[in-house]
Amino acid sequence: MATLLDQLSAMTVVVADTGDLEAIRKFTPRDATTNPSLILAAAQIPAYQSLIDEALRSSRKLIGDAAPVEDVVHEALDEISVIFGKEILKIVPRRVSTEVDARLSYDTDATIEKGRKLIRLYNDAGISNDRVLIKIASTWEGIKAAEVLEKEGIHCNLTLLFGFGQAVACAEAGVTLVSPFVGRILDWYKADTGRDSYPGPEDPGVISVTRIFNYYKTYGYKTEVMGASFRNLDEITELAGCDLLTISPKLLDQLRESDASLSQKLDATNPSGGEEQIHVDRERFDAMMAADRMATDKLGEGIKGFSKAIETLEHQLAHRLAELEGGEAFRHAVQEIFMLNDMNGDGCITRDEWLGSDAVFDALDLDHDGRLTPEEVRKGFGAALTLTTA
């Protein structure tokens, strides 16, 4: 009998939400997505150290021996994203998503320039535009940047999408793909209402993606919908038929191990809802975001989390560059990661405190108890971690 993964793949493009090349080979998805948190997690795997070193050496050579470490690391971030992307494209038949620095999320011009640079690096490596999606946060500034890039033939994936206003603005901008975050929407509602769980059809994240999908298909928008950030199998199966679903290796394993029957829930040829079409300009976008506390909270939180992941990766790259060049290593990088995330200082990090991505949290949470201990973080990042107390 066909597995849940086989059945889902027959009606939806399954995308691997990971930077781990071995996990991608294992599940043979058609696309793959990356972000700074996933690259950070992959960078801890010894097998990929040569890719990191390649990027650092290339960046040093590009900007010169006299350049400060910070400049080399900044250049290497783009190189690393593209190097991992190139390796992923050797495995998946379609596309990889590579993310713009989240710290540029409110700067249209800087986002445009970064998108152009990333696609140029791919082009220089012989990768055509149609195999790459540039991931940009769904701020108004990010959406406007994507609109410009799309007109230049650079395809974009608008991420950190939580509100309907964001979705409509993205479609009107003609972006290639949007990534509404199912699980993070659920997290917010659980925290806000005090409910422990929601049945699949009542899951707020599922309802949000279903609404966006049906709206796009009803009014003929070409923008693809890729549900992301899943917490459980019910969320995934309730969105069977969505254009794409990007799924972590942990949940892909569960899908592959189940032979339960799957029915299609979303149908592009027969969308439901009949919602009135609207136009979203800057004023309406701001008004819709202001009226949607969940979308505002989660967008800001997501940008902050991805920004922190980039900063952590920068620390680790500086450490490695110092090792490669015979300099002094950064011995406190992992301690800084822990102290930064341990908001209440109780010696552990909960999922709510964690500023990075869910995929990294899951990878570090070795005993799957929903709490990261210093030992788990030490093992996960491969560095000594010493906590000091007042």
From Swiss-Prot:
Keywords associated with the record: Calcium, Cytoplasm, Metal-binding, Pentose shunt, Repeat, Schiff base, Transferase
Cell compartments where the protein resides: Cytoplasm
Catalytic residues identified in the record: K135
MF GO annotations: calcium ion binding; transaldolase activity
EC number: 2.2.1.2
Functional pathway: Carbohydrate degradation; pentose phosphate pathway; D-glyceraldehyde 3-phosphate and beta-D-fructose 6-phosphate from D-ribose 5-phosphate and D-xylulose 5-phosphate (non-oxidative stage): step 2/3
SUPFAM superfamilies, sorted: Aldolase, EF-hand
GO cellular component: cytoplasm
Enzyme class: transferase
Binding site for Ca(2+) 1: D342, N344, D346, C348, E353
Annotated Ca(2+) 2 binding sites: D365, D367, D369, R371, E376
Keyword Repeat found: yes
Keyword Metal-binding annotated: yes
GO biological process: carbohydrate metabolic process; pentose-phosphate shunt
Catalysed reactions, semicolon-separated: D-sedoheptulose 7-phosphate + D-glyceraldehyde 3-phosphate = D-erythrose 4-phosphate + beta-D-fructose 6-phosphate
Principal subcellular localization: cytoplasm
Domain EF-hand: 329-364, 365-388
Protein role: Transaldolase is important for the balance of metabolites in the pentose-phosphate pathway.
Family from the record: Belongs to the transaldolase family. Type 1 subfamily.
Descriptive protein name: Transaldolase
